[in-house]
Regions:
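Positively charged, low-complexity, intrinsically disordered RNA-binding extensions
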Residues: 104-160
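Short glycine-enriched loops at secondary-structure junctions
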Residues: 20, 84, 89-92
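Long, amphipathic alpha-helical "stalk/connector" segments that mediate intersubunit docking
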Residues: 12-40
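Short beta-strand segments
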Residues: 17, 43, 88, 143, ...
Length: 160
């Protein structure tokens, strides 16, 4: 079986969407809601480490994808007092090469992935005043208003 890998590592993935607003609802209750900022879908593998997470967080928080007064994407989340909505999404590891039913064997095991997801949330809260989240493992309904749209996929293989 082949994976999208560098060496023998499966990569941590962030899908970053610049939004005007976004929210997460679980069983009819809003678990997180933000205004201008990033909705981040987070894919965690069993091979991810704290060091990888730290590099991904640094890159995420430093991304300059908001427009300055000249209309150039030159401002970071910090610069615009942006907010974060962080959602764990194991389906980022879907392997669709065989048959019609995706395999998710590359996704992190729930216990480890939940700890890593919580670590990412905690680290982001140290830097960004408003950090909201979904509920790990829950069936979530995500609403968002894309700004742009502006969507970036960060793969730890490209930055680590």
């Amino acid at each position: 079986m082949q994976f999208i890998i560098k060496g023998d590592l499966i990569h941590m993935k962030f899908v970053i969407q610049r939004v005007s607003n976004a929210s997460c609802t679980v069983e009819g209750n809003i678990t997180g809601s933000i205004q201008k900022g990033f909705l981040v879908l987070i894919g965690i593998s069993d091979q991810d480490t704290i060091q990888i997470a730290d590099k991904m967080i640094k890159k995420l928080l430093g991304m300059r994808i908001f427009e300055d007064s000249d209309g150039k994407t030159n401002l970071s989340l910090h610069d615009v007092n942006g907010e974060l909505l962080l959602i764990s999404q194991f389906t980022l590891y879907a392997d669709c090469r065989k048959g019609n039913r995706p395999s998710f064997t590359n996704a992190g095991k729930p216990d480890m992935a939940k700890q890593m997801y919580e670590y990412i949330i905690d680290q982001c809260k140290k830097e960004i005043p408003v950090v909201e989240q979904g509920i790990f493992g829950a069936d979530m309904k995500i609403s968002l208003l894309n700004d742009g749209p502006f969507t970036i996929i960060l793969d730890s293989a490209e930055i680590c």
